[in-house]
């Protein structure tokens, strides 16, 4: 008799199911950042301990390296109205009196003013359509529909801003996760204290708990703190639907590892130190950049 079972090394989607009461989902950030909860799991014994996040410094050794993602979240959600729609019969865009809103979520910068976005509703964001944002501050021309229904758009900043990023600062809002329903009072609380390079559509949340003081304490122990870069994109927003996790394909994301960062990580590892990735984004960078020698 053949059992229809996966090898234990292969994970199913159901392996990740768990109950999380809504009342246990924090709607506002704790102050200070490093006073949040920390769960420690001993990978050898399976023992679980509950600590405060700042206690993490007690578990870091002098020869270790802490790898952080210094991406910065942009106010990537903008709402506008379709100004022109593409008329197939005429073969050109014509002015429309449509009043329904069109929402774009910027995911990935392709080049200069061309971005991959999520659009809703899709019927108001077809190739050839032109969307107006901020009563003439910026327009977006829908160029193409690509994998996953993403819209490739070209932005044209018309007034009050010098570039797309400046226009987003005027018009955009932070794309908070759907389980956060409270208004974000301070946008900097959705940034890590070491955020540097704008480009993410969501925060690398594991890093939100670090404070400058905690990072200084970690460095004082002799541990190196090394930045890499991953701009969080579509992969964060698309749900996993495949039953076998190995069949899930992640959307590509922009990453960068400088030569200095690679050298420091490799040196620490060669000397017996541990590589401690802050969150899945830093881990994905290292997994993607590693060669056959690790």
Question: Residue spans of the language-model regions?
Answer:
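Surface-exposed, charge/polar-rich loops and edge strands
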Residues: 2-294
């Amino acid at each position: 008799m053949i059992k229809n079972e996966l090898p234990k090394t292969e994970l199913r989607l159901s392996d990740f199911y768990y109950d999380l009461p809504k009342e246990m989902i924090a709607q506002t950030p704790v102050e200070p950042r490093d006073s949040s909860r920390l769960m420690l799991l001993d990978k050898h014994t399976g023992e679980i301990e509950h600590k405060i996040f700042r206690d993490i410094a007690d578990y870091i050794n002098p020869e270790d390296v802490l790898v952080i993602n210094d991406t910065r979240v942009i106010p990537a959600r903008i709402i506008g109205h379709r100004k022109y729609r593409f008329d197939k019969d005429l073969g050109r865009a014509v002015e429309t009196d449509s009043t329904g809103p069109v929402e774009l979520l910027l995911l990935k910068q392709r080049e200069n003013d061309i971005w991959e976005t999520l659009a809703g509703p899709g019927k108001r964001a077809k190739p050839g359509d032109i969307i107006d944002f901020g009563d003439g501050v910026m327009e977006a021309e829908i160029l193409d529909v690509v994998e996953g229904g993403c819209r490739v758009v070209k932005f044209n900043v018309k007034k009050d801003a010098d570039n797309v990023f400046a226009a987003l600062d005027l018009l955009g809002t932070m794309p908070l996760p759907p389980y956060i329903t409270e208004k974000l009072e301070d946008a900097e609380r959705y940034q890590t204290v070491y955020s540097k390079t704008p480009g993410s559509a969501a925060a690398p949340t594991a890093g939100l708990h670090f404070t400058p003081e905690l990072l200084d304490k970690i460095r004082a122990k002799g541990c190196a703190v090394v930045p890499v870069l991953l701009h969080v994109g579509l992969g964060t927003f698309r749900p996993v639907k495949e039953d076998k996790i190995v069949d899930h394909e992640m959307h590509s994301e922009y990453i960068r590892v400088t030569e200095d960062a690679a050298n420091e990580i490799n040196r620490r590892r060669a000397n017996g130190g541990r590589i401690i990735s802050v969150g899945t984004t830093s881990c994905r960078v290292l997994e993607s950049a590693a060669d056959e020698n690790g």
